[in-house]
Amino acid sequence: MKFNELYIGVMSGTSMDGVDTALVEITDNHVRLIAHGDYPMPAAMKEMLLSVCTGQATNLKAIGELDHQLGHLFADAVLQLLNKSGYVAEQIRAIGNHGQTVFHQPTGDLPFTTQLGDANIIAVKTGIDTVADFRRKDMALGGQGAPLVPAFHKSIFAMQDSTTVVLNIGGIANISVLHPQQPVHGYDTGPGNMLMDAWCERHTGHGFDKDAQLALRGSVNEALLAHLLKEPYLAMSAPKSTGRELFNMDWLHHQLANYDVSVEDVQRTLCEYTAITIAHDVTKFTYGETPQLLVCGGGARNPLLMQRLAELLPQWHVTTTTDKGVDGDYMEAMAFAWLAQRHIHDLPSNLPEVTGASRLASLGVLYSKN
């Protein structure tokens, strides 16, 4: 089956730092990034989303209004990308929209996941068919509904004689393990930038620690680090996924309750926490003479975090997906464009060995522009 189509992927992740868009050309199984964009999220909307995500009191009216507002936000992000790139709606086969996760509960007696952003609004406002709601079919099949991006990584990074691990460091860190002789593995290792960003914003007013300036003024508090490493999630077996429901400021304040640590030392310790939890899991998959770790997401721009990963993984060649020709800042947006293409052509897009689903499935729901 031959394809040569244009798709747009839309992603707003756990960091809630804005909307990423990617216009891609998909030819057979090759994905080429044509254009990309960033669209800011209004501060008031982010504040409301954070309150919902962390379980603060809300109501259905507020959630419904957020769903509506996010639908327009995502549509406007797509329209901005089209205007910037010179393409028009009629040239785009479909949009793949992840939505904004406000709660993800993949385990227990009543597993569910909720993403906001009305795809009806996106389809009608842009004039482009939109695929959304990617996670719930996988969960209906007994899976975690996450991570979904390893299937995309498998399609674009050729298998090597040694292990390739694709590490996305967004709010949460997740890995895709491409082993030459074993099935793909993939799961959330734990916090990525989420705790560092939240701590930095709380104490400096900046949304993230640019160039690790705050962390570099501090030192690792070994006692606090040892305490953080006792988090039960870290010891859970895959498949597993996590999010802001666990790793949030309430969680961090609880961990800090018995420690008198400076702002700078907390930031440095949180950076070390992310690095160690990632390295611990990556090490499990060392295979071959030249295993490589390809980093994407916002964490790839944190020089201290990248330095510590290289130091903690001396056997590994640590670099970025950008260095391999795939822009790491738009990897997830590209992935959801690819997932939309898989849905349009009724192709499987989950990996049961990654999510725990009982079978392969074509994920997502189509929202027509008509």
UniProtKB/Swiss-Prot annotation:
<keyword id="KW-0418">Kinase</keyword>
<dbReference type="GO" id="GO:0009254">
    <property type="term" value="P:peptidoglycan turnover"/>
</dbReference>
<keyword id="KW-0547">Nucleotide-binding</keyword>
<dbReference type="GO" id="GO:0016301">
    <property type="term" value="F:kinase activity"/>
</dbReference>
<comment type="pathway">
    <text>Cell wall biogenesis; peptidoglycan recycling.</text>
</comment>
<dbReference type="GO" id="GO:0097175">
    <property type="term" value="P:1,6-anhydro-N-acetyl-beta-muramic acid catabolic process"/>
</dbReference>
<comment type="pathway">
    <text>Amino-sugar metabolism; 1,6-anhydro-N-acetylmuramate degradation.</text>
</comment>
<comment type="function">
    <text>Catalyzes the specific phosphorylation of 1,6-anhydro-N-acetylmuramic acid (anhMurNAc) with the simultaneous cleavage of the 1,6-anhydro ring, generating MurNAc-6-P. Is required for the utilization of anhMurNAc either imported from the medium or derived from its own cell wall murein, and thus plays a role in cell wall recycling.</text>
</comment>
<dbReference type="InterPro" id="IPR005338">
    <property type="entry name" value="Anhydro_N_Ac-Mur_kinase"/>
</dbReference>
<dbReference type="GO" id="GO:0005524">
    <property type="term" value="F:ATP binding"/>
</dbReference>
<dbReference type="Pfam" id="PF03702">
    <property type="entry name" value="AnmK"/>
</dbReference>
<feature type="binding site">
    <location>
        <begin position="13"/>
        <end position="20"/>
    </location>
    <ligand>
        <name>ATP</name>
    </ligand>
</feature>
<comment type="similarity">
    <text>Belongs to the anhydro-N-acetylmuramic acid kinase family.</text>
</comment>
<dbReference type="GO" id="GO:0006040">
    <property type="term" value="P:amino sugar metabolic process"/>
</dbReference>
<keyword id="KW-0119">Carbohydrate metabolism</keyword>
<protein>
    <recommendedName>
        <fullName>Anhydro-N-acetylmuramic acid kinase</fullName>
        <ecNumber>2.7.1.170</ecNumber>
    </recommendedName>
</protein>
<keyword id="KW-0808">Transferase</keyword>
<dbReference type="GO" id="GO:0016773">
    <property type="term" value="F:phosphotransferase activity, alcohol group as acceptor"/>
</dbReference>
<dbReference type="InterPro" id="IPR043129">
    <property type="entry name" value="ATPase_NBD"/>
</dbReference>
<keyword id="KW-0067">ATP-binding</keyword>
